[in-house]
């Protein structure tokens, strides 16, 4: 990777966008930080998906050293897409994350959403972000704590999946009905669609709504196909729809 970066630097390479996701260790994170230092320009869109854990637990790759580097990456980004576990890890570290995550699970409906909004606002402010998008929030109540982009909530008490967006001080939610179980790779797809839209200078609201609709279709297809959760989701069928979208 270093030789490739050296060659790109000679050629004056300047990407429109940089998107980082899963990093296995501190060494990989250091390489990405070096990449950002060398190639990020004033107008480069930087999106970081700080993959470190889920469902209130850190992944096996997690170390305090990796967290420190994720913090550096997040400080270099305009937009981040953590799940709730990762948002708490960025703010508080592993031990405090576990306590706070457990506390959030004890809250119902609206109260839980309100606390997550505060977490999103704190994250955006502390890291000086254009937007913090906290993904994969399960929700069952009918009312919402902030304006929602997608109002597919006609069926009372049906399970919804929500994504919180805190953008330049504004707070809103994007909900869609939950279909099936938990599938590998959905966070990667969400962040990929989001980053591509932002590079095309679409609004954050448009990008998030687009990513949620795309994932909803892909997950529904996956459930119908009976695909194992570890094999990811059947998204290929819907790529054409993304290609047809204009700015």
Name each region found by the language model.
Residues 205-247:
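Charged C-terminal helix
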Residues 61-171:
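Conserved phosphate/ATP/ADP-binding segment of small-molecule kinases
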Residues 1-60, 236-246:
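Conserved N-terminal subdomain of the carbohydrate kinase-like
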Residues 171-184:
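Short pre-catalytic strand/loop immediately N-terminal to key active-site residues, enriched for Gly-Thr
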Residues 181-204:
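Short, small-residue alpha-helix embedded
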Residues 17-20, 47-55, 81-90, 102-103, ...:
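Short beta-strands and strand-loop turn motifs
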Residues 171-172, 197-211:
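Phosphate-handling active-site elements
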């Amino acid at each position: 990777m270093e030789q490739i970066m050296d060659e790109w630097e000679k050629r004056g390479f300047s990407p429109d966008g940089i998107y980082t996701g899963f990093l296995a260790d501190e060494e990989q994170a250091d390489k990405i930080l070096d990449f950002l230092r060398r190639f990020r320009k004033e107008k480069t869109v930087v999106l970081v998906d700080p993959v470190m854990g889920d469902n209130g637990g850190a992944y096996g790759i997690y170390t305090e050293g990796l967290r420190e580097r994720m913090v550096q990456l997040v400080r270099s980004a305009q937009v981040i897409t953590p799940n709730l576990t990762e948002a708490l890890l960025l703010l508080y570290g592993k031990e405090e994350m576990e306590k706070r995550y457990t506390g959030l699970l004890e809250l119902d409906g609206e109260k839980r959403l309100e606390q997550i909004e505060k977490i999103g606002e704190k994250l955006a402010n502390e890291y000086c972000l254009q937007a913090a998008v906290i993904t994969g929030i399960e929700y069952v109540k009918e009312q919402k704590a902030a304006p929602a982009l997608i109002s597919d909530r006609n069926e009372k008490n049906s399970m919804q999946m929500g994504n919180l967006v805190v953008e330049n001080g504004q707070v809103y939610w994007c909900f869609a009905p939950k279909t099936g179980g938990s599938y590998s790779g959905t966070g990667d797809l969400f962040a990929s669609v989001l980053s591509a839209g932002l590079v095309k200078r679409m609004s954050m609201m448009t990008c998030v709504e687009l990513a949620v609709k795309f994932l909803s279709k892909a997950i529904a297809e996956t459930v119908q196909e009976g695909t194992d959760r570890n094999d990811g989701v059947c998204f290929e069928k819907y790529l054409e729809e993304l290609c047809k979208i204009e700015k």
